[in-house]
Amino acid sequence: MNLYNAVVTAAAKESKDKGVLVAMNGLILGAQSTVKMNTVDVQTFQAPNSGALGYVLNGKVFYNQVTLKKHTTQSVFDVTHLNALPKVGIVYSYSNIEADMVTPMLNNGYKGIIHAGVGNGNIHQNIFPVLTDARQKGILVVRSSRVPTGPTTLDAE
């Protein structure tokens, strides 16, 4: 049924200009908001921060809301002039993480480091100086959270 609903959604004139969509379990989700919430659950794909955009019923699509985020060709991520994506590392942080888990990224051609922290994207004191050093070397550092919903806030450390 998911494949059928996906085809119905893609073919529907109502889906035009809605960006990339996910049609699963009778729902229509915006791809930017879709998260896999469970390792084995059949209804694992959800949009916990925004909810479903609509649903498919009896071969017809019904939209309840629209996405306000820029998407597809209007996205802020323009990669049309890139020949290759930059080398970016992801640090899955945890309590008492050691600096040597991050230090190799500073001298091996990384252009960015994504810090996937606990809670509000918290950075453990052991690696804070290494990430500061990375910034001083021109490496972009992004603080994120492994928690599937909610933002990371400024000045959380």
Regions found by a protein language model. Name each.
Residues 1-3, 35-38, 105, 128-130, ...:
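Short, glycine/charged-enriched secondary-structure capping and boundary segments
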Residues 1-34:
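Short, glycine-/small-residue-rich phosphate/pyrophosphate-handling segment
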Residues 4-11, 54, 128, 132:
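Predominant activation on well-ordered alpha-helical scaffold segments within soluble catalytic domains
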Residues 14-19, 24-25, 49-50, 85-88, ...:
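Short coil/turn connectors at secondary-structure junctions
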Residues 21-25, 92, 116, 144-145:
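Short beta-strand segments
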Residues 27, 95, 148:
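Short, glycine/serine-rich, charged loops/turns that create anion-binding
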Residues 30-115, 120:
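Accessory alpha-helical/coil subdomains and C-terminal extensions
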Residues 120-157:
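C-terminal non-catalytic interaction/assembly regions of soluble proteins
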